[in-house]
Amino acid sequence: MALQQIVEPIVTGLGYALVEIERSAGGLLRVTIDLPWPAPNGAAAEPAPDGALALEPAPSGAGTLDTAPDGATALETVPSGATALETAPNGAVSTPAQSVTLEDCEKVTRQLQFALEVDGVQYQRLEVASPGIDRPLRGEQDLLRFAGSVIDITLKAPIGGAAAGKVGATRKKFRGTLERTASGGWQIVWSDAPPPKPGQRVGKKRLPAPLQALGFSLDEVRDMRLAPIVDFKGRTGKAGAAPAG
């Protein structure tokens, strides 16, 4: 049985949403969970219409639980700044991040350990975590949930002829604001203007670079995540939050 078929029913059956399953070096099996998100009134979670990429001017205007069979326990910091706790499969602890709590991770870990053992899944450590600041976006429900956020998107193939001379035809990576189109599809809107350097004064007469928009379908996307935007002046911005001003 595929790993997804084992893990997802356990996670959803406990009242959570499965975000991602990853296998890493050293036998680490990482399962990322989140609280389910109800679609707002009138926002049906349906696949966006298929369509070719189109580039055009835009209109103006984590708690982590890490378990190991050897019974060792170690507290460490994960890359996203959340806290990870390693324990044996027969005991589990976790810490809260975003809306998923330590108790949530503990509950899922206990059930997964049993299910993985029954199905003979090989792993050295099991880590149950909430999404970090670069949360992956997998489907239409995620797009509806994070519409208006700044995201990083990587296409499966270069933009090619859709670039229309406005960006490099070989470009595959974009960062911008996720928006719904009038036709019900999805687009990312951005400006290629370089940000001002620290201490640089921007003249009032300086015209802003025009916004551009790239329409896409999920089939054309290799990877899509919330942009990990951090304010180094001492305040950490919300993941994927659109810059103010």
Swiss-Prot record:
Protein's UniProt keywords contain Acyltransferase: no
Cytoplasm as UniProt keyword: yes
Organism: Verminephrobacter eiseniae (strain EF01-2)
Family annotation (InterPro entries): Ribosome_maturation_RimP, RimP_C, RimP_N, RimP_N_sf
UniProt keyword annotations, A-Z: Cytoplasm, Ribosome biogenesis
Biological processes annotated in GO: ribosomal small subunit assembly; translation
Leader peptide range in chain numbering: none
GO cellular component: cytosol
Cited Pfam families: RimP_N
Similarity section: Belongs to the RimP family.
Entry-linked SUPFAM superfamilies: YhbC-like, N-terminal domain (SSF75420)
Role: Required for maturation of 30S ribosomal subunits.
Compartment(s): Cytoplasm
Protein name: Ribosome maturation factor RimP
CDD domains found in the cross-reference section: YlxS_C (cd01734)
